[in-house]
Curated annotation (Swiss-Prot):
Gene3D superfamilies: ACP-like (1.10.1200.10). Pfam families: PP-binding. It comes from the Eukaryota. Residues 1-39 form a transit peptide. GO terms for molecular function: acyl carrier activity. It comes from Arabidopsis thaliana (Mouse-ear cress). GO terms for cellular component: mitochondrion. This is Acyl carrier protein 3, mitochondrial. Its main location: mitochondrion. It is found in: Mitochondrion. InterPro entries: ACP, ACP-like_sf, PP-bd_ACP.
Length: 131
């Protein structure tokens, strides 16, 4: 998978429009990058829904998907007919959108938008505590 990813990075441009991550100011006056503002407390207040909607919108923008078929549980391979190269491009777009890195072994296990949102949410508190 690493070879495929490297090859894609060298030869292909993604046709997914990704909005830049904005800096958000928290109550202490410090600025932080958007997604890292989510905590487990925010998840209880709808943070997962926000992440899920961002993931779904990103998948809908991918030019090889039928927007009407993209749902939380639509399987990337079975329902959306994405092959391994398409999925690799999609994972790269998700990494860029959320400013995270998804290891290849984890990326292989992400089969739908819901899995991606759950993974992002599970990784966010770890990233926030490292900063």
């Amino acid at each position: 998978m690493h070879c495929i990813r490297s090859s894609i990075l060298q030869h292909l441009r993604l046709r997914v429009s990704v909005r830049p991550t904005s800096l958000l100011q928290n109550e202490n006056g410090f600025k932080s990058i958007g997604i890292f503002n989510f905590t487990s407390e925010a998840a209880a207040d709808g943070g997962q829904d926000q992440i899920l909607s961002r993931v779904i919108e990103l998948v809908k923008k991918y030019d090889k998907t039928n927007t009407s078929e993209v749902t939380e549980r639509a399987d990337f391979q079975k329902d959306l007919s994405l092959d391994s190269l398409d999925k690799t491009e999609l994972v790269m777009a998700i990494e860029e959108e959320f400013s995270i890195e998804i290891p290849d072994e984890k990326a292989d296990k992400l089969t739908c938008c819901g899995d991606v949102a759950t993974y992002i949410l599970s990784e966010t508190p770890t990233k926030a505590s490292e900063s």
